[in-house]
């Protein structure tokens, strides 16, 4: 197999990294932005959720666009948009971009909604590229490599942006976060996609061809599980740094260093989850249990570590437990996306948009709901809720059948 498809997979990983730098930049900058612009935690939670509202609403159109135009053009255009909107965010509070506290909140809500919409193509377009360029037997690991960019971007953001922020302010940190997006946008413009016929050396199975409908019970359960996974994962994307600083009382730089730990671990756990899933599929477990095993294990034990992190009084132990929970939550990404491809067939971009919309509906709720739960019930109980949701997400995989032979009954299920 040519190495060119895997070079494109690495560029997809770099694109995911750049997208997450633009996504989580406000979580870091928020430590100084909130007092500077007079925003409360609840207002900041709404701003975080505005990103996810735009991101979720545009998932399906973005997936359809990727199916029609291809990954290269869609991702190049999207990355240029991330740069432009992030620059406007850095100017928030200057001139006409918000002169009062209420106006400032509205400006940030609008800009975060727009950048969320602009980031919507990232993973549906990446899934469309992987489906076109990589044989099915290797799609678990390919998806794991791509989505490892989530961990890389999230790991880089706190330490790098905190250094920039402490020296030059939160506006400079936001601008710095957009530079990788500019680089990948230019890279996509100069990249040629391989010929599909030369890549698909392993033909899609008849099962995949027959199961292109997004109305199957398996696809609905897959999307529901990914929604619950998104609720848990986005707590760490948006609130972990502020949780460590404000609840566990670490200083800015130490909090930044510790908040990178989950993402450093996930750089390993995400591709590892895909590799393990591919090997289990190729081994005795077959397609059904081979794809189920990693999500069942990962989401269940993520819930266990969330509960341990919530109840410990030791701040350093909490960092370790919650970092392990994050790594396990994200280790399931490869199996989720590979299973979606096995169900969706040629409609991978659209199906990826539907599934990714689900996880971002969960992510839309958690950044806004978590500080409310923390304010009324305490952070411990807010994390207990997340632990229960993670275990529920794992249990849904018992009803997901990537292959017809693994379906719970011989009759097709639709909803």
Task: Tell me what each language-model feature is.
Residues 7-41, 236-241:
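Extracytoplasmic
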Residues 26-27, 217-271, 333, 337, ...:
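Extracytoplasmic gate region of multi-pass secondary transporters
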Residues 49-63, 260-273:
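Central cavity-lining transmembrane alpha-helices of secondary-active solute carriers
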Residues 57-100:
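Conserved MFS/SLC helix-loop-helix module at the cytosolic interface between two early adjacent transmembrane helices
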Residues 73-88, 288-306:
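Structural signature of the two symmetry-related core transmembrane helices
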Residues 111-150:
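Cytoplasmic helix-loop-helix junction between adjacent transmembrane helices
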Residues 146-193:
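Helix-loop-helix hairpin linking two adjacent transmembrane segments in secondary transporters
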Residues 189-209, 406-412:
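Flexible cytoplasmic inter-helical loops of multi-pass small-molecule transporters
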């Amino acid at each position: 197999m040519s190495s060119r498809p895997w070079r494109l997979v690495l560029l997809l990983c770099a694109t995911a990294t750049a997208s997450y730098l633009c996504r989580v930049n406000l979580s870091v900058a928020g430590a100084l932005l909130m007092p500077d612009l007079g925003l409360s935690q609840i207002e900041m939670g709404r701003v975080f959720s505005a990103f996810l509202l735009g991101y979720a609403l545009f998932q399906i159109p973005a997936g359809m666009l990727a199916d029609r135009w291809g990954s290269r053009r869609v991702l190049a255009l999207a990355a240029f948009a991330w740069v432009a909107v992030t620059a406007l965010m850095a100017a928030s509070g200057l001139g006409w971009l918000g002169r009062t506290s209420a106006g400032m909140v509205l400006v940030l809500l609008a800009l975060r909604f727009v950048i969320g919409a602009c980031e919507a193509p990232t993973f549906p377009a990446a899934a469309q590229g992987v489906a076109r360029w990589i044989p099915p037997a290797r799609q678990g690991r390919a998806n794991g490599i791509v989505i490892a960019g989530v961990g890389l971007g999230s790991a880089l953001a706190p330490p790098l942006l905190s250094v920039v922020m402490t020296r030059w302010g939160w506006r400079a940190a936001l601008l710095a976060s957009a530079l990788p997006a500019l680089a990948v946008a230019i890279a996509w413009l100069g990249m040629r996609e391989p010929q599909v016929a030369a890549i698909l050396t392993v033909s899609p199975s008849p099962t995949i061809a027959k199961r292109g409908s997004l109305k199957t019970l398996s696809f609905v359960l897959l999307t529901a599980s990914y929604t619950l996974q998104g609720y848990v994962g986005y707590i760490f994307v948006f609130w972990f740094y502020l949780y460590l600083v404000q609840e566990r009382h670490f200083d800015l730089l130490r909090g930044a260093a510790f908040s990178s730990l989950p993402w450093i671990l996930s750089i390993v756990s995400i591709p590892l989850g895909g590799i393990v899933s591919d090997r289990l599929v190729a081994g005795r477990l077959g397609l059904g249990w081979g794809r189920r095993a990693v999500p069942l294990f990962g989401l269940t034990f993520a819930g266990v570590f969330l509960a341990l992190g919530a109840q410990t009084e030791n701040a350093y132990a909490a960092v370790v437990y919650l970092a392990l929970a994050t790594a396990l939550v994200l280790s399931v990404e490869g199996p989720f996306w590979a299973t979606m491809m096995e169900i969706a067939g040629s409609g991978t971009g659209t199906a990826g948009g539907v599934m990714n919309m689900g996880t971002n509906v969960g992510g839309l709720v958690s950044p806004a709901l978590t500080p409310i739960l923390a304010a009324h019930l305490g952070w411990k109980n807010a994390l207990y809720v997340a632990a229960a949701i993670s275990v529920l997400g794992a249990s849904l995989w018992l009803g997901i059948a990537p292959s017809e032979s693994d379906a719970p009954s011989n009759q097709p299920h639709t909803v």
